[in-house]
Amino acid sequence: MKRLLLVALMVLVSLVGMAMVNPVIAQQSAPTSEKAKQIEALVNKAAALIESKGKAAFPELRKKDSRWFSGDTYLFVYDLKSNVLLNAAFPAREGTNNTGQKDANGKLFHHDFIQMAKSSKGSGWVDYMFPKPGQTQPSQKWAYVRGFNLGGVPSLVASGFYPE
């Protein structure tokens, strides 16, 4: 009986430990600001647009000073193998692969984006450290990620903001 209780306790401790380490299982509190709501709506509308038009929607999503790309708010699209299909703010990254890239704290945030898109909910918030435009020092950034299909290919679309 003691042995069974010990095994059950070890399993419980392991699950709690995994939840603390895995940001997809146990995220910090998702942002609830007005900006967060705007980002979430933007990503959901972009997913619908891309699902309907496919890659033909990309030129529209790249337009600066539009509803899709304004200031430091822009969209990015990856397939679930971490290949960059669209990055409105950093077009040179398109066609590259983000596998293994870490933020300033060593977090594999691209991996976390993919895990969020694959999660049972299919969408949610991921936080990471990333420099603000024109800066080199990383700041906390939140990205809302949503999984969707791009011409039958499982993909994700996301956008983020700096909370400070």
Residue ranges, per PLM feature:
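N-terminal membrane-sensor/transducer module of prokaryotic signaling receptors
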Residues: 2-6, 11-164
